Design a protein with these regions (language model features):
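Short structural boundary motif marking the start of a folded domain
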Residues: 2-9
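Residue-level signal for short segments within beta-strands and strand-turn junctions
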Residues: 10-12, 50, 101
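Short, surface-exposed acidic/glycine-rich loop or hinge patches that mediate macromolecular interfaces
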Residues: 13-16, 91
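Short N-terminal binding/cap micro-motifs at the start of the first secondary-structure element
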Residues: 15-19, 43-44
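Generic structural detector for well-ordered beta-strands
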Residues: 21-23
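Glycine-rich beta-strand-centered segment in the early N-terminal region that forms part
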Residues: 25-39, 52-101, 106
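Cytochrome P450 core scaffold surrounding the K-helix E-X-X-R motif
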Residues: 44-50
Length: 111
């Protein structure tokens, strides 16, 4: 029987973390799922924890700098295969706005 849930440290609201079982995410076509091995907390996570970000919604799972192992693939492009060790670039970006051209994809103005 395959695992159907995973552990997640959920920030329910400012200053309130809750370790809980959450459903294992489905893998949509063209994507791969990564089983986390290590996750880092950065300044934006601290701001979220303290409630200092106006753009933030709760609940949320902190930690967007991570590495892991691919555990499922659903037609993902490229040379990916189950068992590959990967790190994740956590930002979607347009690649052409001022912020993206300055390698500050986390500040992309087009998304």
């Amino acid at each position: 029987m395959s695992q159907k849930t995973m552990k997640a440290l959920v920030l329910e609201e400012a200053f309130h973390l809750n370790l809980k079982d959450v459903p294992l995410p489905e893998v949509p076509p063209g994507y791969a799922r990564v089983k986390m091995l290590a996750i880092s907390i950065c300044g934006s996570d601290i701001h979220a924890y303290r409630g200092n970000s106006l753009l933030l919604t709760y609940p949320r799972v902190l930690g967007h700098e991570l590495c892991g192992v691919i555990d499922e693939i659903n037609g993902a492009p490229g040379d990916l295969k189950v068992g590959d060790r990967v790190s994740v670039f956590p930002y979607l970006s347009c690649g052409s706005c001022v912020a993206c051209r300055q390698h500050r994809e986390n500040c992309c103005t087009s998304l």
